[in-house]
Regions:
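Short hydrophobic beta-strand element within catalytic cores of glycosyltransferases
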Residues: 297, 303-306
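Acidic anion/phosphate-binding donor-loop and adjacent secondary structure
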Residues: 37, 136, 165-166, 178-195, ...
Length: 371
């Protein structure tokens, strides 16, 4: 057994929980271990009560190659558990406690655990979303409690970093969302299409959970301008918004033959197939913190089209890896037509290949050291 003091104790979703936060936590902590930084992850015995979880399951069947210990210890709704966890942290005595934050449901457990910590343990808030995408009662008050127990903060984008800076005088380090290290290998486009039983049309895809703020209705509307083009739309991900309204919209616009839907949470191999089969990945969000899909699209060297909003547009504009559209269906349809042109595809793919070397977990950890 390793008796060396834990450098980083990380509270976050991790296996067996599914999703991008869990996936990236594994890449992050594996990289910490590879840098000889002793790391342990404490995840949740209960994260979301079933009553408020909108999906089919919170759990993943995927197996991760992890180099660190994961313990399921934190219950988000049990105050007695919070005190117990705080005592366990003090006993372990890590140099840093990293609290990964993406939802107000974490504020109370993080606050009460932090309240009873040994003050020598430095607490870092690692922030995915600062403002919840859907309105939550008392969010500002809850977030202030969380802020009180953190010594400093790290964000995955300037957009989120600026939001945090508006709320606190504590140190905030704005970084970037790295490309995960455990992604399945790139697949040839023809093989990916064959795997998914797709025809030879151009394909553009929306990948991820379908929620109201993701702008999928706008994306569907853009295809009324593309009816006569050899382009099909893939919507792949679990619907957290009622699917019927999207199906009704598709039928009303006469787009049944143009839209392919997979209403399932996608494991990483399926995400790989859809992105590799696509000519473009589209993120038509109405608001965003940053995107976990952008680094995945970069890994698979697929150009992007994103909304003209903070949190999405900056990386695309900086790297010239796709197009930014002005938040109307008509403008999105024009961006799609422009971006599937051969010369544009070659340019964007070339720019992605040059840029993606910047977005590594290794570089993220080097930047993190300054905090």
């Amino acid at each position: 057994m390793n008796s060396k003091r834990i450098k980083f104790l990380v509270f976050s979703a991790s296996y067996p929980y599914r999703g991008g936060i869990s996936d990236s936590t594994h890449s992050f902590c594996n990289e910490l271990i590879d840098n000889n930084l002793n790391t342990e992850v404490w995840t949740f015995s209960l994260l979301y009560p079933n009553l408020i979880f909108p999906g089919k399951t919170q759990y993943s069947n995927e197996k991760y190659n992890q180099k660190f210990i994961v313990r399921r210890l934190i219950n988000t709704i049990n105050p007695f558990n919070w005190i117990k966890v705080s005592k366990k942290v003090n006993k372990l005595n890590p140099e840093f406690l990293i609290l990964r934050y993406w939802s107000p449901i974490l504020c109370l457990p993080y606050f009460f655990i932090g309240l009873f910590l040994n003050k020598k343990i430095k607490v870092i808030g690692l922030i995915d979303n600062w403002t919840n995408h859907e309105k939550v009662p008392f969010e500002n008050i809850l977030r202030k409690l969380f802020m009180n127990v953190c010594n400093s903060f790290i964000s995955f984008s300037d957009n989120v970093g600026n939001e945090i800076k508006f709320s606190t005088q504590k140190k905030v380090l704005s970084l970037f969302h790295p490309i995960n290290t455990n992604l399945p290998k790139i697949k040839d486009k023809h093989k990916a299409k064959a795997n998914l039983d797709l025809d030879k049309s151009y394909h553009v895809s929306f990948i991820g959970l379908i929620r109201k703020y993701k702008g999928v209705e706008l994306l569907i509307s853009s295809f009324k301008y593309l009816k006569n083009e050899n382009i099909k739309l893939i919507i792949a991900g679990e619907f957290y918004d009622p699917i019927d309204k999207y199906l009704n919209q598709i039928n009303k616009l006469g787009l049944k033959e143009k839209v392919i839907i997979e209403n399932n949470f996608l494991e990483s191999s399926k995400i790989r197939d859809y992105i590799c089969a696509s000519d473009l990945v589209i993120q038509p969000y109405t608001r965003a913190s940053q995107s976990g899909i952008t680094p995945v699209a970069y890994f698979y060297e697929t150009p992007l089209i994103v909304s003209n909003i903070n949190g999405l547009k900056e990386i695309i504009q900086r790297d010239k890896s796709g197009e930014v559209f002005n938040n109307t269906a008509k403008d999105l349809s024009k961006a799609i037509l422009n971006s599937i042109k051969r010369d544009r595809q070659e340019l964007y793919i070339s720019n992605i290949r040059k840029s993606k070397v910047k977005y590594t977990w290794s570089r993220f950890i080097k930047e993190l050291e300054i905090i």
